[in-house]
Structures are given as structure tokens and as C-alpha cells.
């Protein structure tokens, strides 16, 4: 335990130094976030904020690529993180668009196909201690849904200072407790949490750096693969809390607009709706933290009481 705490203590300051250097480097080079005109007007002041702070999430898992127990989790994090990095770089090159949504989903599918080869191939799906499904076809379908959906969901959540990072932190703390009997996996999660804390040091409102797609996709790949390894694929519905709500708000908005030519929300994802309703950014973030935590606790109660 002392060794674990020592490693994370040192890692925290290493990540802080890396992020501080990365922020200063981008400022000196004039690199920063481009805010699109159709976004909330309150975000225009964020223009020019350094990006791609999520690179530290890839650094946190890279050493674990060389261990059998953590290879799949690390590979998932790195591959999805690299997809996000390419998207960030394209956004810097062409400020209006990065990788097109359909192409991004297709690339996510290719990555998931690669990851399936290295996955545990345990086709059983549990709810608590109860075996719900034992079917390779259904499991493969669920595997692809999870690995594609979670990174994209966290990417949609990453729209306010500290929102995606803070909610991911809550999810990972619960996954750390659940994984504590797997020493290498627990160490990897603890280092990711440490990287997140270092990132949030600079991402708290007003943010000095954004995680970028590289961070959102890396976190998504990490959380999704952890749920597969820990056999909590169904519990992930609750562990995803706010990520799921944000994604559903986009789906509902698009579907209803195509159907009725009307919008349910002032803007989606739903955190922008509350911004346009006049809520302060910090109030939205903290209330979303609370909702996310309550959903996870509710899911855990159902999981263990089953």
C-alpha cells in the first residue's frame, strides 16, 4: 500500500509538470481551442485555450502495455486515444471540422475489431452474481456497442470545464474499489486517477487546458475495456451515468428534429441546454457530478441486492 501511494504521489507531480510544460508550449506557439460560432456565446472567451491535455492519460497506461493482465486495457486506451489525437490535429488544421462523425464511428469499429482479437473472450454476461447471458453472438454485439459507444459518449460530455474529467474520476474510483484484488489492474486505474487529478488541477473553471478528443477517447477506451475485463458490462449502464444522458440528449434532439422539425432542447448535448437557460457553468458541472454519483450508487445497490 505504501509503495502504491508513493508511486501515485510522484506520478501526480510528474503529470503536473508535463501538463504545465504542454500548456506553456501551446501558448508560446499560439496553439489553442477554436470555438465554433454556433456554440453558446459564453464559450467564446475560451477561444485559444490550450488543448490535448488528455495526452497524460495515454502516458499513464503506456507502461502497462507490457503486462498480460493489463495489455487489453492499455491497448484500448492508446488506440482510442490516438483516434482522438488525429481528430484534434485535424481540427487544428481545419478549424470547422475534424474527422467526420460517420468516419469516426467507422474507425472506432475498426479499433474495436482489433481489440476483440485481444479481449478475454469470456462470453458470459452477469448482473451481480447472476448469469444473464451465455451466448457468443450476443456478447460480441454487446462488446462492440460498449467499445464504440463509451468513448464517443465521453467525447460528447466534454463540453464544460471539469465535466468529463470529474465524472470519469467518479466512475474510476468505483472501478478501482471493484478491481482492488487485481493488483496490476488496480495500479493502472490508480495511475489513471492520478493523471485525471493532475489534469483537473488545470481544467477546473476557468480551464487552462482542455483534454481534447485524445483525452475523451482515451478515457472512454479505458473505462469500456475495464468493464469488459471486470465483467461488469451491464453495470456500465449505471457507471456511465451522465455520459449516457448526454448521448441520449443528442439522439433525442436529432431524431425529434428530423421527425417534427422542432427541437426538444435549446441545444444538445444537454449541458448546453442548461447554459442557454442561464445556469452558471460551475453549477451545471456540480449538479451533473451529483446526478452521476446518484446514478452509480443506485446501480450498485441494484447490482449487489440482486
Swiss-Prot record:
Q: Does the keyword Membrane apply?
A: yes
Where does it localize? Cell inner membrane
Membrane topology type, per the record? Multi-pass membrane protein
Q: Which family does it belong to?
A: Belongs to the glycosyltransferase 4 family. MraY subfamily.
- Keywords in alphabetical order: Cell cycle, Cell division, Cell inner membrane, Cell membrane, Cell shape, Cell wall biogenesis/degradation, Magnesium, Membrane, Metal-binding, Peptidoglycan synthesis, Transferase, Transmembrane, Transmembrane helix
E.C. no: 2.7.8.13
Q: What is the name attached to this protein's record?
A: Phospho-N-acetylmuramoyl-pentapeptide-transferase
List, alphabetically, the GO terms of the cellular component aspect.
plasma membrane
> Catalytic activity, per the record?
UDP-N-acetyl-alpha-D-muramoyl-L-alanyl-gamma-D-glutamyl-meso-2,6-diaminopimeloyl-D-alanyl-D-alanine + di-trans,octa-cis-undecaprenyl phosphate = di-trans,octa-cis-undecaprenyl diphospho-N-acetyl-alpha-D-muramoyl-L-alanyl-D-glutamyl-meso-2,6-diaminopimeloyl-D-alanyl-D-alanine + UMP
Q: Name the Pfam families on file.
A: Glycos_transf_4
Q: Which GO terms describe its biological process?
A: cell division; cell wall organization; peptidoglycan biosynthetic process; regulation of cell shape
Q: In which pathway does it act?
A: Cell wall biogenesis; peptidoglycan biosynthesis
Function of this protein? Catalyzes the initial step of the lipid cycle reactions in the biosynthesis of the cell wall peptidoglycan: transfers peptidoglycan precursor phospho-MurNAc-pentapeptide from UDP-MurNAc-pentapeptide onto the lipid carrier undecaprenyl phosphate, yielding undecaprenyl-pyrophosphoryl-MurNAc-pentapeptide, known as lipid I.
Q: Which organism is it from?
A: Dictyoglomus thermophilum (strain ATCC 35947 / DSM 3960 / H-6-12)
NCBIfam families listed in its UniProt record: mraY
InterPro entries registered for this protein in UniProt: Glycosyl_transferase_4 (IPR000715), PNAcMuramoyl-5peptid_Trfase (IPR003524), PNAcMuramoyl-5peptid_Trfase_CS (IPR018480)
Transmembrane ranges?
2-22, 47-67, 71-91, 105-125, 131-151, 162-182, 185-205, 209-229, 236-256, 284-304
Q: What is its main location?
A: membrane
Amino acid at each position: 500500500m505504501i509503495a502504491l501511494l508513493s508511486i501515485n504521489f510522484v506520478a501526480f507531480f510528474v503529470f503536473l509538470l508535463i501538463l504545465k510544460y504542454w500548456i506553456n508550449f501551446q501558448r508560446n506557439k499560439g496553439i489553442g481551442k477554436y470555438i465554433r460560432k454556433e456554440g453558446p456565446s459564453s464559450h467564446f472567451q475560451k477561444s485559444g485555450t490550450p488543448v490535448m491535455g488528455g495526452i497524460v492519460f495515454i502516458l499513464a497506461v503506456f507502461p502497462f502495455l507490457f503486462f498480460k493482465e493489463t495489455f487489453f486495457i492499455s491497448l484500448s486506451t492508446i488506440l482510442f486515444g490516438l483516434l482522438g489525437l488525429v481528430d484534434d490535429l485535424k481540427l487544428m488544421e481545419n478549424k470547422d471540422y475534424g474527422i467526420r462523425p460517420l468516419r469516426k464511428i467507422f474507425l472506432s469499429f475498426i479499433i474495436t475489431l482489433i481489440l476483440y482479437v485481444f479481449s478475454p473472450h469470456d462470453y458470459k454476461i452477469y448482473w451481480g452474481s447472476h448469469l444473464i447471458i451465455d451466448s457468443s453472438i450476443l456478447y460480441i454485439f454487446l462488446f462492440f456497442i460498449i467499445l464504440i459507444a463509451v468513448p464517443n459518449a465521453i467525447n460528447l460530455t466534454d463540453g464544460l470545464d471539469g465535466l468529463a474529467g470529474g465524472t470519469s474520476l467518479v466512475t474510476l474510483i468505483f472501478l478501482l474499489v471493484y478491481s482492488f484484488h487485481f493488483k496490476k489492474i488496480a495500479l493502472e486505474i490508480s495511475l489513471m486517477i492520478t493523471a485525471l487529478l493532475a489534469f483537473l488541477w488545470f481544467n477546473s473553471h476557468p480551464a487552462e487546458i482542455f483534454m481534447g478528443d485524445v483525452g475523451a477517447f482515451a478515457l472512454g477506451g479505458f473505462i469500456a475495456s475495464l468493464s469488459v475485463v471486470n465483467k461488469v458490462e451491464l453495470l456500465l449502464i449505471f457507471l456511465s451515468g451522465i455520459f449516457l444522458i448526454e448521448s441520449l440528449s443528442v439522439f433525442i434532439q436529432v431524431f425529434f428534429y428530423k421527425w417534427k422539425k422542432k427541437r426538444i432542447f435549446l441545444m444538445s448535448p444537454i449541458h448546453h441546454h442548461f447554459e442557454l437557460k442561464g445556469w452558471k457553468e460551475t453549477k451545471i458541472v456540480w449538479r451533473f457530478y451529483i446526478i452521476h454519483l446518484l446514478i452509480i450508487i443506485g446501480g450498485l445497490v441494484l447490482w449487489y441486492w440482486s
